[in-house]
Regions:
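Short, positively charged
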Residues: 4-20, 68-70
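Alpha-crystallin/small heat shock protein
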Residues: 2-5, 59
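Short linear motifs in intrinsically disordered/low-complexity regions
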Residues: 7, 35-37, 61-63
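Amphipathic, hydrophobic secondary-structure cores in small proteins
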Residues: 12-49
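C-terminal structural segments of small proteins and small subunits
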Residues: 43-70
Length: 70
């Protein structure tokens, strides 16, 4: 899992797993999900991030968490 903030795009992207994006669905005005060909969730994008989170909280917010297999 990887969390990335793009200040220029004013967006946050949470990568849940690797794979090829087959389709993208907008769940709300500022919430978009990427799905693979089977409909599995690959990532979540939150737009207009600066309206939701204080800019100083986002200054260096890039987190990568390896997911282990169970």
């Amino acid at each position: 899992m990887k969390l990335t903030v793009d200040p220029e795009a004013d967006a946050l992207y949470l990568t849940l797993k690797g794979g090829k994006v087959s389709r993208t669905e907008e769940l709300a005005d500022s919430l978009i999900v990427d799905l693979d060909e089977t409909g599995a969730l690959l990532g979540i994008e939150v737009l207009w991030l600066s309206y939701r989170v204080a800019p100083e909280a986002l200054a260096n917010l890039n987190i990568e968490l390896p997911l282990g297999k169970k």
